[in-house]
Structures are given as structure tokens and as C-alpha cells.
């Protein structure tokens, strides 16, 4: 009798150890990123609640798109999972499930959970099998970054998308494929009699329907592999019907309808951007800046730019000699081409222009494509440049300034008198009076050339 009593006390102690109040409250493990915990199988076959908590960390901008993943590696689905902010909350959920009146059609069983990096979260696992718990940290979650970028892109492109016919048909086809199941349920509801008792049946049917939808979502990959042909036929038929309905209705033409579509798209983009990060305060701040930049009047933006440029003007860069010569050649060719195009157009009064010119034949040849300078002028220009480059060092070495000549007698840069005068200076002075008359004639020609230039 004494040994039998000890055996009963031992068995009672083992069963008492499985009560949540005795084990779950003390069996708590705090995890850090990179933690790996391997738990062995319960040899007594009892389900033991173990709670795993992530304490969270401080909010930082660098962790805007960071994600913490809780990975549960277990061989079967023979386990229960509970969530909460604290171990006490997890324990309370565990106790609530032990009640005879609890219905758990939507019990959470996921082997991969995404946790907020900035909040404390606890997960309770109740199982008799061996399993492994891993906590991973992803500093930059590319999926969340892509979700944020798509949300901002939809927000900025909502006005154009609301008027795009291709986008209208694509969205209509997608909605038709997803909503076809609801149409089937609606048609099936028409077959039931409209009585008070049937509402309870319909409510229960909707609950079972949601449960079926959840099971379909959990086993979507298996369904796509097993019933690939049926799924493809369903997508083709419902997509074609949806396209025909959208084609019959047509894209919205009313400006108010387009505005409503734009608002809906902007709301969808804002929701996508908001749920793309666990750092909600930073995301809200970014979205406020995006809204202000999107709806900010352009006139205000231009005024701010003008005031900023006036207060901090840009430093102008001077052209180099090579850039100046290149720009001169390009602009001269462009101006000559525009002039030739104008004189050949009906807008130009050719006879009136030719009546004012001293050399109409040269003007006519220029209009027909001839160059604007002849060979002699080009040679004079090249010779003048060479002489000016040779004379520059000599002028710098001479300290005494040259005697000033009268302004009305200064030779033109490309004039023929300049070269004749230079040739005469190199020859000995003649004693006859005929040279004086030639000099006066050259001066008269020079004055005539100046008047023509002016």
C-alpha cells in the first residue's frame, strides 16, 4: 500500500507539471537575433507550454526596413501556438484554449512568423514533439523595401493610372477572377428560402466558408501543383468574362469618376507604404513629406527656387580659349544657316534687300549656298591674326607707348591700306610729290570704308 501511494503521488506530480500555472509561467526564454534552441521530445507524451520572447530594441532610422523572423522547425502539425506581448498574456491565451467552450477554427499555426524589431513579443509553443526555434534578423528586407517603393509609385501615378485604359482592363480582370467565387456564393444563396431559420444556417455556412478559404490559402502551392489544369481553365474563363464585361462598360470618362478612382489608388498606395515597415512613425513622416511634395503648388516651388538663387547665386564659369573658338564656330555656322534659310523663304523681300546692297551678286551667291567670305578676305584675316600674335610679345617688352594717331585715320584691321602702308614703311622715302598724292588717296579710301562699315 505504501509503494502504491508513492506511485500515485508521482503520477499526480507529473500531471501537475503540465498545468500552465506551474510550468508555463517559469519556462520562458528570451531570444536575441541568431539564437538557436533545440528542444527534445517529452518522453511522457504530455504537451508542455514553453514561451519564447523577443525583447525588442531601440527605434533607429537605419532599421526602417528591418525584419525579425521567428522560425519553428517541427516534424508535424501536432502542436499549438499562442501569441502575446508578455509571457503572462501568452499564458492567459493558453488557459482560455483549455476551456470546454473555446472554439478554435482559426488557430494560428505558422512555422515562420515576422516580428517587429522594436516591440517585445512572445510566442508560446505547446507540443510533445521535439522542435527547434531559431530567431533571425534581416537588416534590409528587400520585400518590404519593394512594397514601400510600389506604394509611393502608385501614390504619384494615381492621376495618370485613373485615365489609363490598359490599367482599367487589367484591374477589372483581376477583380473579376477574385470576385467570381463571391458571385457563385451569391447565386447559391438565392436558392435558399428567405426565412428566419435560414439566417442561422447561412451564418454557419459563411463561417465554414471562411475556414475553407483559409485552408485553401494554406495549401495553395499543393493545389496549384495537383490541379494545375483546372486552375488554368478557371483563370482563363473568368478572365475572359471579366474582360468582356469591362469592354462593355468601358473606361470611366466622367472626371468625377476618374477622381474617385484616383483617390482609391492613392489610398491603396498609402496603405501599402504604411504597412511596409515596422517603424510606423518614420513611415508616417515620409508619407507626409510625399503628400506635401505631391500637392505643393508649382508656383510656390518656383518662388522658393528664385529666392534661393538670388540669395546664393551660382558661380559662372568662364570659357576657355578652345571652348570660345568652338562655340564661335558653331554659333556662326548656325546663324549663317538661319540667314540663308530666311532669305530663301517667302517672308523675305529679296528685291527690297538687294536694292540696299552694294554687291547684290554676292548676296545672290550666298543665298544659293556660296560661302560668306572669299579667299582674299580669309587670307587677310589669317594674316592679321598671325601679325597680332607676333606683335603681342613685342608690345609687352616696349615700355614707352606708341604715338597716338587721330581716331579718324586709324586703319581697319582687314583693310588693304594697312598692308600697303606697311610695305611703304619698309621702303626708302621718295623725294617726289606723287607719293603724297597717293597717300592722300589711300586715306580717302580708308575713310570711305569706315563709312560703309558704320
Curated annotation (Swiss-Prot):
Ranges of Polar residues composition bias in the record: 414-424
Topology class, membrane: Multi-pass membrane protein
Record-annotated membrane-spanning stretches: 138-158, 166-186, 197-217, 231-251, 280-300
Name of the protein this chain belongs to: Nuclear envelope integral membrane protein
Keywords of the record: Glycoprotein, Membrane, Nucleus, Signal, Transmembrane, Transmembrane helix
Organism of origin: Drosophila melanogaster (Fruit fly)
Family: Belongs to the NEMP family.
Tissue-by-tissue expression: Expressed in both germline and somatic cells in the larval testis and prepupal ovary (at protein level). Also detected in the larval eye and larval wing disk (at protein level).
Location of the region described as Disordered in the Swiss-Prot/TrEMBL record: 388-454
Subcellular location: Nucleus inner membrane
Skewed-composition ranges (Acidic residues): 388-405, 428-446
The organism's place on the tree of life at top rank: Eukaryota
Main localization (coarse): nucleus
Listed InterPro entries: NEMP_fam (IPR019358)
Amino acid at each position: 500500500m505504501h509503494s502504491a501511494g508513492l506511485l500515485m503521488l508521482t503520477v499526480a506530480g507529473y500531471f501537475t507539471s503540465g498545468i500552465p500555472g506551474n510550468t508555463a509561467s517559469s519556462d520562458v526564454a528570451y531570444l536575441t537575433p541568431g539564437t538557436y534552441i533545440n528542444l527534445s521530445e517529452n518522453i511522457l507524451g504530455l504537451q508542455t507550454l514553453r514561451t519564447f520572447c523577443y525583447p525588442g530594441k531601440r527605434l533607429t532610422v537605419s532599421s526602417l526596413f528591418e525584419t525579425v523572423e521567428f522560425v519553428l522547425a517541427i516534424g508535424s502539425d501536432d502542436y499549438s501556438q499562442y501569441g502575446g506581448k508578455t509571457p503572462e498574456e501568452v499564458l492567459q491565451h493558453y488557459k482560455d484554449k483549455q476551456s470546454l467552450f473555446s472554439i478554435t477554427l482559426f488557430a494560428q499555426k505558422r512555422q515562420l512568423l515576422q516580428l517587429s524589431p522594436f516591440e517585445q513579443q512572445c510566442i508560446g509553443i505547446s507540443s510533445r514533439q521535439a522542435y527547434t526555434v531559431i530567431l533571425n534578423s534581416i537588416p534590409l528586407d528587400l520585400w518590404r523595401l519593394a512594397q514601400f517603393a510600389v506604394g509611393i509609385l502608385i501614390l504619384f501615378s494615381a492621376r495618370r493610372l485613373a485615365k489609363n485604359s490598359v490599367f482599367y482592363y487589367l484591374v477589372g480582370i483581376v477583380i473579376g477572377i477574385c470576385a467570381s467565387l463571391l458571385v457563385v456564393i451569391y447565386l447559391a444563396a438565392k436558392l435558399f428560402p428567405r426565412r428566419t431559420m435560414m439566417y442561422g444556417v447561412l451564418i454557419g455556412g459563411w463561417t465554414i466558408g471562411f475556414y475553407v478559404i483559409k485552408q485553401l490559402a494554406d495549401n495553395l502551392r499543393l493545389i496549384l501543383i495537383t490541379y494545375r489544369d483546372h486552375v488554368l481553365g478557371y483563370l482563363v474563363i473568368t478572365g475572359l468574362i471579366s474582360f468582356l464585361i469591362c469592354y462593355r462598360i468601358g473606361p470611366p470618362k466622367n472626371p468625377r469618376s476618374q477622381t474617385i478612382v484616383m483617390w482609391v489608388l492613392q489610398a491603396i498606395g498609402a496603405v501599402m507604404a504604411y504597412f511596409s515597415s515596422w517603424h510606423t512613425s518614420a513611415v508616417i513622416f515620409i508619407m507626409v513629406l510625399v503628400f506635401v511634395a505631391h500637392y505643393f503648388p508649382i508656383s510656390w516651388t518656383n518662388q522658393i527656387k528664385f529666392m534661393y538663387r538670388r540669395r546664393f547665386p551660382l558661380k559662372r564659369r568662364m570659357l576657355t580659349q578652345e571652348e570660345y573658338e568652338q562655340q564661335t564656330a558653331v554659333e556662326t555656322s548656325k546663324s549663317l544657316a538661319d540667314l540663308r534659310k530666311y532669305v530663301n523663304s517667302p517672308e523675305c523681300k529679296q528685291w527690297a534687300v538687294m536694292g540696299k546692297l552694294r554687291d547684290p551678286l554676292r548676296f545672290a551667291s550666298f543665298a544659293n549656298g556660296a560661302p560668306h567670305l572669299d579667299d582674299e578676305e580669309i587670307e587677310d584675316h589669317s594674316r592679321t591674326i598671325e601679325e597680332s600674335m607676333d606683335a603681342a610679345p613685342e608690345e609687352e617688352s616696349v615700355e614707352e607707348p606708341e604715338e597716338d594717331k587721330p581716331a579718324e585715320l586709324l586703319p581697319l584691321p582687314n583693310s588693304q591700306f594697312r598692308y600697303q602702308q606697311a610695305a611703304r614703311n619698309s621702303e626708302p622715302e621718295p623725294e617726289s610729290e606723287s607719293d603724297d598724292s597717293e597717300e592722300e588717296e589711300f586715306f580717302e579710301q580708308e575713310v570711305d570704308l569706315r563709312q560703309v562699315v558704320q
